């Protein structure tokens, strides 16, 4: 079992252990992706996130 989350009506995360909510919405993993020092595409990802204003402030 992994910790999962879905967004509540107020936009905040609601944590659960289920893969699907009772309303039928698929939940997302609450854990970050694995880090690899050999990541070849990190610069492109950061550039895209900066371009579309998706970086946390």
UniProtKB/Swiss-Prot annotation:
The lineage of its organism: Eukaryota, Fungi, Dikarya, Ascomycota, Saccharomycotina. Non-catalytic component of the H/ACA small nucleolar ribonucleoprotein (H/ACA snoRNP), which catalyzes pseudouridylation of rRNA and is required for ribosome biogenesis. This involves the isomerization of uridine such that the ribose is subsequently attached to C5, instead of the normal N1. Pseudouridine ('psi') residues may serve to stabilize the conformation of rRNAs. The H/ACA snoRNP complex also mediates pseudouridylation of other types of RNAs. The H/ACA snoRNP complex mediates pseudouridylation at position 93 in U2 snRNA. One of its GO terms (cellular component) is box H/ACA snoRNP complex. The keyword Nucleus applies. Its main location: nucleus. It comes from the Eukaryota. One of its GO terms (molecular function) is snoRNA binding. Keywords: Nucleus, Ribonucleoprotein, Ribosome biogenesis, rRNA processing. Belongs to the NOP10 family. It comes from Eremothecium gossypii (strain ATCC 10895 / CBS 109.51 / FGSC 9923 / NRRL Y-1056) (Yeast). The keyword Ribonucleoprotein applies. This is H/ACA ribonucleoprotein complex subunit NOP10. One of its GO terms (biological process) is snRNA pseudouridine synthesis. Component of the small nucleolar ribonucleoprotein particles containing H/ACA-type snoRNAs (H/ACA snoRNPs). It is found in: Nucleus, Nucleolus.
């Amino acid at each position: 079992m992994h910790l999962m989350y879905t967004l509540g009506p107020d936009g905040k995360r609601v944590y659960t252990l289920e893969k699907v909510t009772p309303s039928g919405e698929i939940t997302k993993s609450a854990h970050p992706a694995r880090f690899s020092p050999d990541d070849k595409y990190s610069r492109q990802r950061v550039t895209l996130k900066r371009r579309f204003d998706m970086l946390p402030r």
